């Protein structure tokens, strides 16, 4: 009886030891947090049953019972696709992550597995082909993009569908791009052609003292929001224009930038000495748009004053624009009247406690009358 128990114990120990055989995949993941690049090892493993190990040792080739294990492992590994680096706000701290894609090298892994089993080892290395994303965390670090620098936000609540569509299309074109050191950000160049072929739809734009429909109506929500982010980052302005009249979507008054290619553009220079990386985000429920700027820690502090508004003027007379949704004789309010006014915003940039630059945004707005849509045959259009 004692001999039988000893034999069973030895068999269980041997079985347990054999069951410990693992296929091991080792890699690493890089992150940026609080200005530091950190690399952390990751390990994944797949168990090979003792029966499969014994069968392999017996016939000196991989047992057919291992094939389903390799199939499942391959499916898991190949499902991992490369993901470019992005920053996310995690509990108030900005963290950059990416993901390297994997593809199982099945032949090399099988060779490692067979060799390890026949050598009496309890692990074998999984071999994968790695696909590093074009924009990796390490690339961000190499370019000096280690910190969250500034944020610009705006609210487009009340926008008609066409306007929201153009805002989201425009913002997506400015999501995840670099501004090289010394390079001038050029809004019109980055956005590219604005028409149906690039995803934009027709919407109202300010033209000829009233509203008219053109491709990309609402794109100024995008230019205004990224302007706010880059202005908060302390970048010098090389070109910026205000709208001809105050537009409610762009309050605070004067803290905005209109564009109308090719005559009006937004251009600002990256003078930080390192790359800047721009991310866009939007919330279609809250109707908010946001741009975040990431780069080097320049030691700058930027203070932007509230607008000082003067020189108020009464709204202008109403104007009319064709709208085929309106019945003859009727009218539809498209835009509300606005007073004329002048807004001045002051920006003070400090470094090391000393003022290094100071500038003002002066915006002069003409009086604006209500705009009504009327039937295209309406006499008020004459």
Spans of model-derived segments:
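Active-site-proximal acidic segments at structured loop/helix or strand boundaries
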Residues: 33
